[in-house]
């Protein structure tokens, strides 16, 4: 009996030892962070290391970025290869969405609800546009146009401009649900920027350049009447390269680079502030009754603006100001040595994020 029992015991011990080794080496899996609600598909990589850039400054990305945007408690950005990343503001962790990559990506625009992106890419040296849905990960090629933008009031609506060689160019409405175009207004012009700040209002202007005398036109879609906002003001010189930025509530900034002037208007087009400093509208963000702006501290008076700024030829020290829009008081909260800060976002009462075009980096700043 003992002669048969010993082999059986040996087999049992061998199986137990193998099971223990397998559990120690394989059975214990590393936990993978949960995906945020806007990423139902694709793979999520493990957290990447975040680089500390100073006591109050946190660099988010490791690779140069095309820019970023904020949605809920996440900061999303593309690197120069078209890979998509997101940073969790709650856990302070950075993740890569490995199921998404766009070749030849040169920029993007974000819808009001932050759920859709207009992707800007190049094909045979020609600018093209696609619509990317963050929830479904579906991509739709938009019809060939020269410029397209989201409306501020409906993420399924937008505005487009299309140049025509043998007839008048067209400004119209885009329906992003089926990628259809609806012509609304004919115009003899080319290379226009277009905006859709209100349901019955389209704004258009020449692409800003030092060599182009500027006008900013407000088109009432009900009456088809057009108003030139620039003609309502008297300037000591004709402004060129005028730039505009609309905020979610319909208010907007108007910048006159050739005159080094910056103005803030209400939704009703009433001039509220003529600031004592100059900066480019892309360097500002409005949050309730506060305006945050990164402003150059040294700007060559001979520089051709905004052309040299668009071309990345200007680097300068900057200050970030917090401006109270109720009384106009200005407070400096940060100063850089060399930077080109754009796309400020308010994270909390003492924290903002921004993108630096010089370093190609996204930063979190606590003040």
Regions inferred by a protein language model and the residue ranges of each:
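Short, solvent-exposed loop/turn segments at conserved positions within beta-propeller repeat blades
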Residues: 77-80, 122-127, 163-169, 207-214, ...
């Amino acid at each position: 009996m003992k002669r048969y029992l010993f082999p059986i015991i040996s087999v049992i011990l061998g199986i137990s030892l193998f099971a223990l080794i397998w559990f120690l080496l394989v059975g214990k899996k590393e936990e993978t962070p949960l995906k945020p609600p806007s990423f139902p598909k694709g793979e999520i990589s493990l957290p990447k290391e975040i680089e500390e850039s100073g006591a109050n400054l946190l660099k988010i990305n490791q690779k140069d970025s095309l820019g970023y945007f904020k949605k809920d408690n996440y900061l999303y950005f593309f690197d120069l290869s078209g890979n998509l990343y997101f940073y969790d503001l709650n856990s302070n962790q950075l993740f890569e969405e490995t199921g998404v990559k766009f070749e030849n990506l040169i920029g993007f625009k974000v819808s009001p609800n932050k759920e859709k992106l207009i992707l800007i890419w190049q094909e045979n040296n020609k600018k093209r546009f696609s619509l990317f849905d963050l929830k479904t990960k579906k991509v739709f090629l938009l019809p060939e146009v020269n410029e397209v933008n989201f409306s501020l009031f409906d993420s399924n609506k937008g505005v487009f401009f299309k140049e025509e060689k043998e007839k008048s160019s067209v400004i119209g409405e885009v329906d992003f649900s089926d990628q259809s175009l609806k012509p609304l207004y004919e115009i003899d012009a080319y290379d226009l920027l277009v905006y859709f700040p209100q349901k019955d209002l389209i704004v258009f202007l020449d692409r800003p350049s030092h060599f182009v005398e500027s006008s900013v036109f407000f088109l009432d879609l009900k009456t088809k009447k057009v108003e030139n906002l620039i003609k309502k003001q008297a300037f000591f010189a004709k402004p060129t390269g005028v730039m505009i930025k609309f905020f979610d509530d319909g208010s907007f900034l108007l910048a006159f680079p050739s005159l080094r002037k910056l103005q803030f208007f209400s939704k009703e087009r009433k001039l509220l502030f003529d600031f004592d400093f100059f900066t480019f509208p892309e360097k500002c963000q409005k949050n309730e009754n506060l305006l945050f702006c990164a402003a150059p501290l040294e700007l060559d008076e001979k520089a051709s603006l905004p052309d040299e700024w668009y071309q990345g030829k200007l680097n300068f020290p900057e200050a970030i100001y917090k401006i109270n829009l109720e009384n106009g008081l200005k407070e400096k909260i940060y100063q850089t040595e060399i930077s080109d800060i754009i796309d400020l976002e308010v994270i909390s009462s003492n924290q903002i994020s921004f993108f630096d075009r010089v370093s190609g980096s996204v930063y979190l700043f606590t003040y």
